């Protein structure tokens, strides 16, 4: 257990520190108008449009809208998708949206508030409430499109956005089905640590650190960047500062660390992704400590939930725990020989057929 905790802590620290350095259609523009920075294989038969819309806080959300062939001839089912936490729509969420479009769904991948190309005066911060609201704002947008059936809209959350997708489905009854992949409950993760390893004493130390950081930010009139999950050394000292990580993967790196590194630093690198080029604001965890994303998990029913996790994923327990807590209808799918990051972009491991079947059956 200790090895797993230290491994995940190393990953999170790494992700926060490397290279610190007139209607809705009128808001659309062709994806080709600007340089295409998507990091996955692009299908020429699937049209993508750059779109913008506002959430109820007035924050402008940027999205990539993927359109199935012959979409104008009918009212289509639709899906909103976002994640992983700190990633951008040109990475995993865009891959998912494009693939779901091949199954006949209008699919919208979006950057949450304060990240990517979306608005928000403070950059690189997050809120469980606002990120959840972004899902509902995406539903608003889709439901006003002439070619979308507003009664057939679903949601997908990847990694850390899974909790927001489920929470949105618990309140927004317009979301008729919700699926998660490699789920993380960010409220639980930030306030309790991986596998809930924080002791009461450690939790107190983190609260003191976050409180003191607020004084520093107030005095400097800036928002310092830092690790969103502080960790503790062998002497139980809180280690909150960013750790310098070599550009090259260390030879002794374990498989979990290597999987994250190879995705964010190598094959799916994107300059706007928080998970590699910069960091979250240091005080960002405060709102996740204050508000639990899973507080209304039982309210999701009767909206169907599909939880997908790899059998080797360090995050698997999140999906299993939510499956136990959620009411029917619900389904848990464990993908054989798959780790956490495999479900970001491994086309041989992501069960798109299952996702298509799930949404086809429940978006009727």
PLM features: what roles do these ranges have?
Residues 32-74:
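N-terminal cap/lid segment of alpha/beta-hydrolase-fold proteins
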Residues 74-84:
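Short beta-strand element of the alpha/beta-hydrolase
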Residues 86-98, 112:
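The serine-hydrolase catalytic nucleophile loop
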Residues 99-119:
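Conserved alpha/beta-hydrolase
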Residues 125-146:
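Alpha/beta-hydrolase active-site loop
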Residues 167-259:
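Alpha/beta-hydrolase-fold enzymes
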Residues 300, 307-309:
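Short beta-strand/loop motif that positions the catalytic acidic residue
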Residues 338-349:
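Catalytic histidine-centered segment of alpha/beta-hydrolase-like enzymes
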């Amino acid at each position: 257990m200790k090895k797993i905790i230290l491994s995940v802590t190393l990953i999170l620290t790494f992700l926060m520190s490397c290279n610190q350095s007139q209607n809705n259609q009128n808001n659309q523009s062709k994806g080709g108008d600007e340089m295409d920075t998507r990091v996955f294989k692009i299908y020429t038969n699937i049209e993508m449009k750059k779109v913008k819309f506002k959430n109820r806080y007035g924050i402008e959300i940027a999205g990539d809208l993927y359109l199935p062939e012959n979409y104008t001839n009918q009212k289509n089912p639709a899906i909103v998708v976002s994640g992983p936490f700190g990633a951008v729509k040109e990475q995993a969420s865009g891959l998912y949206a494009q693939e779901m479009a091949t199954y006949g769904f209008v699919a919208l991948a979006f950057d949450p508030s304060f990240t990517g190309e979306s608005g928000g005066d403070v950059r690189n911060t997050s809120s469980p409430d606002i990120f959840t609201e972004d899902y509902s704002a995406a539903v608003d947008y889709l439901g006003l499109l002439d070619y979308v059936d507003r009664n057939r809209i679903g949601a997908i959350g990847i990694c850390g956005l899974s909790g927001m997708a489920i929470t949105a489905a618990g309140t927004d009854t317009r979301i008729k089905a919700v699926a998660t992949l490699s789920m993380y409950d960010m409220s639980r993760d930030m306030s309790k640590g991986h596998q809930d390893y924080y002791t009461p004493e450690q939790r107190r130390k983190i609260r003191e650190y976050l409180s003191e950081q607020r004084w520093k930010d107030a005095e400097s009139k800036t928002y310092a960047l830092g690790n969103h999950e502080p960790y503790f050394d062998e002497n139980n000292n809180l280690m909150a500062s960013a750790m310098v990580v070599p550009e090259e993967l260390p030879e002794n790196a374990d498989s979990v660390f290597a999987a994250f590194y190879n995705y964010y630093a190598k094959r799916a690198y994107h300059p706007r992704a928080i998970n590699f080029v910069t960091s979250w604001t240091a005080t960002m965890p405060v709102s996740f400590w204050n508000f639990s994303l899973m507080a209304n998990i039982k309210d999701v029913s009767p909206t169907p939930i599909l939880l997908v996790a790899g059998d080797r994923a360090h995050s698997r327990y999140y999906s299993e725990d939510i499956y136990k807590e959620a009411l029917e209808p619900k389904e848990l799918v464990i993908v054989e020989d798959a780790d956490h990051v495999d479900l970001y972009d491994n086309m041989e491991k992501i069960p798109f057929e299952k996702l298509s079947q799930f949404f086809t059956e429940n978006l009727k």
